[in-house]
């Protein structure tokens, strides 16, 4: 079972923060509670409810916590399609959402995957400050500002430092420019 949880806050001041060198830019997903814990708790509750209804079964929730191919599963489950920036896009919600999976040993019907809808758009590719989207659907993590500011152990390579601007934790440029995100739904979460 693949699920999504919106995280776009009502007061998402992307441009004003990025344009103000006195402020540090933090990726939108990191502004609220730890989504790993929150979504995992909800998936566990869903598993418990399914078990209460169906009887004994095995299940395990995953939220970016194991080598589970979340995007591939979400695409196959019909949550959306893989955009050229390599994120899942949804016609009604854009890409501002988290993914989670509940692996379960219960046969369930499978939803139809959505067709790719990016067409000729290359906005995410051309806006990437470091050229990390090296081809449609291909991101070179070693160039991605999100990787460089969150995952990289050690110093950020000198060639990328001027391109960071005031980004101190993550980068949302490819999502901000994506036309599908004009349909994004605000989060129901209060933080």
Regions found by a protein language model. Give the residues of each.
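Auxiliary alpha/beta "docking" domains used to position bulky ligands
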Residues: 2-117, 156
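Iron-sulfur cluster-binding cysteine motifs and their immediate structural context
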Residues: 123-147, 153, 167-190
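Phosphate-binding glycine-rich loops and adjacent basic patches that engage nucleotide phosphates
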Residues: 1-13, 86-91, 127-143, 190
């Amino acid at each position: 079972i693949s699920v999504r949880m919106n995280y776009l806050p009502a007061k998402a001041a992307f441009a004003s923060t990025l344009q103000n060198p006195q402020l540090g830019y933090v990726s939108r997903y990191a502004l609220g509670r730890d989504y790993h814990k929150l979504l995992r708790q909800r998936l566990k509750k869903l598993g418990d409810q399914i078990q209460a209804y169906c009887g004994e079964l095995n299940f395990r929730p995953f939220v970016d916590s194991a080598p589970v191919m979340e995007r591939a599963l979400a695409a196959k489950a019909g949550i959306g399609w893989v955009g050229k920036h390599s994120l899942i896009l949804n016609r009604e919600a854009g890409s501002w959402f988290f993914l989670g999976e509940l692996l379960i040993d219960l046969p369930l019907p499978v939803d139809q995957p959505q067709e790719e809808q990016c067409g000729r758009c290359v906005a995410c590719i051309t806006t990437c400050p470091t050229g990390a989207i090296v081809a449609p659907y291909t991101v070179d993590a070693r160039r991605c500002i999100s990787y460089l500011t969150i995952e990289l152990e050690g110093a950020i390579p000198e060639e990328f430092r001027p391109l960071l601007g005031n980004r101190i934790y993550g980068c949302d440029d490819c999502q901000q420019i994506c036309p599908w995100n004009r349909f994004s739904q605000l989060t129901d979460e209060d933080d």
